[in-house]
Amino acid sequence: LPLSEIYEVATFYAHFNIVKDSKDYNPVNVVRVCESLTCELFGAHKLLQDIKKLENKNIKVVPGPCMGRCNVAPTVCVGKNYVDVANFDKVKKTIDEKNFDPFIPDYINVSSYKKNGGYEIADKIKNGVISKKQVLDSLNESGLKGKGGAGFPTGKKWEIVSNYNGKKYVAVNGDEGEPGTFKDRSYLESDPHRFLEGALIASYFINAQKVYIYMRDEYPTVIKILLDEINKME
């Protein structure tokens, strides 16, 4: 693998730290000021300049791309902890208190989800109580389409993959990452099992071997919630 390709990937993702020599690398707490269009409109550029004054040997302040929190702009990520509707005083307080870990909000956990009928449909599909034809008919009748831009009918997509002979996998893009998109983070932080059950239903329908979930590093809260809840289910 050419070093140029490694460098290309490493410099593309904002959460990689590029250093000239690993011997000189000093792990620090990184403070990232979102510089998306929305945050810029709410004064992110001036905020970045002000917060730069807080830099020391343990704190590094850098700009960062859209963090999926456009509804609470401007936002600043202190370590893994987000300061929403941020200002200098709020960020300084968070740094002084060494509050670097992600905040975990109240959400629907696996026991609460199951009490309200969660995973019943997935289990019925897995056990054949609900047939693949019934699933396909429901998808087609609903008119559900992909949200990635092409608007491809979900039922047709599942049918094509289901008929494929060979190893199959479900790959879930947890967030598209474009500016203004915070709907994914919002429901994943509040109702994660609706998402997980949907992934399982897709995997049972196409007879997938595994489900892979991609989640951007800007969503540490979602990552922790999903890991904790998946561990409970295992």
Task: Name every feature range the model reports, one short phrase each.
Residues L1-E234:
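Feature of Fe-S/electron-transfer and energy-metabolism proteins
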